[in-house]
Amino acid sequence: RALKTREDIFDIYVQPIPWGKTSWLWKDDDERRNIDFLLAKTIAHIDSGGKFDVSLQVTIPNEWEKLAPINIGITAGIESDKVSAKWLESCNMMSKVLTISEHSVKSFTDTIYDAINNQTGEKFKYCLQSPIEYISYPALKHEPVNLDLDLTTDFNFVTVAQMGPRKNFEMTVKAFVESFKDDESVGLIIKTNIGKNSLIDRENCKNSLKVLSRSLGDRKCKIYLLHGALTEAEMGGLYTNKKVKALVSTTHGEGFGLPLFEAAYYGLPVLATDWSGHLDFLCKKVKQKNNKTKIKPMFGKISYKLAEIPEHAIWENILIKESKWAYPELSSVKNNMLKVFKDHGRFKKRAKELQNWVCKEFAEDKIYDKYVKAMLDVIPDDLMSSSPTWLNEIEDIIKEYE
């Protein structure tokens, strides 16, 4: 999207890559049709022996390659406080690294390994050497689409979290049930999946929730499972539903935290772990009279302790054993949920203030301009002054006809 704002200087090609077990999403709109056109264009270009001047590789760093003279790695970074040596090695192959939050930058720049030069035997400190900066995601507000959620409760929390160790959604459920087990007017909507949006995945989610719910004892409060792919407009409908009062996240860590960001720019109060990438947009920067900038938290801060990630969460070359992430405190989660329930007006007023700031600070054109500038910073002037490949090809065809 950022590149398309400057098609006068960028000749764009696209090559899709798989991501785990995630399904390929499809929708019939202008953007998808353009992507399909670019895919076909890329295949034809490669088949004809075409080369590329610059590669932008949007994936985890250990999958980055030297595909062009100039290579820019784009990653959401890591959710813990330290990256793997493999990631540093991949980053140092890149002309530049772009990530998405101050937390992610810090995880890269703070990671240092003891290494040995194989040729000299000399010990040295191995760290990030390529330039790195972060550019946030843009606020992409859509006209909300009404969702028929069939809610029987008037006050509902929502959590958007894939089932897995890092999102820690079990703590969200536990805190909710222990806080509202005797109140039949309160509900928790869980927007989740395990890996896909299939019927089998839905059944597996239902079974997991049933087991978790039974372990927490009898309750009057309601738990709703929301499963399947929703459009951006439908997610907007979820965040703006009159019966949905706050989003809660007990995450161990986020590179950015897109659902929290979406909730913020739709004006929904957010309760979240007070650590990692989402602090970039949940804390408003306020200029004081002395021209100094003050960081003002605009969300329900869930207290935490920083400790090493558990054994079952280790992911080779990604989430490493010696790294740490946040462990939210159950009492703080419950306290925040009860506060927003009892004093929702105050939280909603603050959320509206945050919404106004986020929509201005993270506006699409502002974010896209930052991406374009970041790329131009590493592209030599002589390359930018030359005509794009597609223009040269068109000129050759015209000459043949002449």
Predicted regions and their residues:
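Conserved donor-binding/catalytic core segment of Leloir-type glycosyltransferases
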Residues: 149-167, 173-176, 188-190
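Extended catalytic core of nucleotide-activated donor transferases of GT-like folds
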Residues: 21-109, 234
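Short hydrophobic beta-strand element within catalytic cores of glycosyltransferases
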Residues: 269-272, 283, 289-301
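Aromatic "clamp/platform" in nucleotide-sugar-dependent glycosyltransferases that forms part
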Residues: 252
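A short alpha->beta transition loop at the rim of the catalytic pocket in nucleotide-sugar-dependent
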Residues: 243-245, 267-269, 274
